[in-house]
Swiss-Prot record:
This is Cytochrome b-c1 complex subunit 10. The lineage of its organism: Eukaryota, Metazoa, Chordata, Craniata, Vertebrata. The keyword Plastid does not apply. GO terms for cellular component: mitochondrial inner membrane; mitochondrion; respiratory chain complex III. It is found in: Mitochondrion inner membrane. It comes from Homo sapiens (Human). Keywords: Electron transport, Membrane, Mitochondrion, Mitochondrion inner membrane, Respiratory chain, Transmembrane, Transmembrane helix, Transport. Belongs to the UQCR11/QCR10 family. GO terms for molecular function: electron transfer activity. Component of the ubiquinol-cytochrome c oxidoreductase, a multisubunit transmembrane complex that is part of the mitochondrial electron transport chain which drives oxidative phosphorylation. Residues 1-12 are mitochondrial matrix.
Amino acid sequence: MVTRFLGPRYRELVKNWVPTAYTWGAVGAVGLVWATDWRLILDWVPYINGKFKKDN
């Protein structure tokens, strides 16, 4: 839908910048997990969720 409004030059620029945007998005997500309570976020990941169960 967005490509309908963009010209061919900008379509090519967007295609070139998509991997960079994904990389920075991944870095931002890892930074968010690092800066916040990592356990709160990683409790939603299925494999890691079972690793840190407390035996009460």
